[in-house]
Amino acid sequence: MAVALALAAAMQPAAAADDLKLGEALLTRNCGSCHAIGRSGDSPQKDAPAFRTLGSRYPIESLEEALGEGVMSGHPDMPEYKFDADDVGAIIAYLKSIQQR
């Protein structure tokens, strides 16, 4: 039992790193043409908020439902996005990791 717990604990950082990489890749592919995805830089579309500032607008966790059910925007230029549960978890983990403090 102790070996299994130690193995699971050792695997968590790798899984977390994989989630961060997946979240960043999903956001870059689906959102990067308009939004700044990383910890720095300007959004390609000046009116699109940088994702590192989303936490100042609302709790990042509040995006979970919208990402899973379909992100819809109030403007016609933004397409609707819908992600599966694993992708949502990765996106939320990545967004939390880049928030400005």
Regions found by a protein language model. Give the residues of each.
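Bacterial N-terminal signal peptides
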Residues: 1-10
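Electrostatic cytochrome c docking/interface patches
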Residues: 9-26
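Localized chelating/binding microdomains
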Residues: 20, 28, 86, 98-99
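Gly/Gly-Pro-rich "capping" loops immediately C-terminal to redox-active cysteine motifs
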Residues: 22-24, 38-68
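The canonical Cys-X-X-Cys-His
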Residues: 23, 28-37, 91
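Residue-level signal for short amphipathic helical patches enriched in basic/charged
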Residues: 29, 54, 58, 73
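Axial heme c-ligation environment in periplasmic c-type cytochrome domains
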Residues: 45-53, 66-98
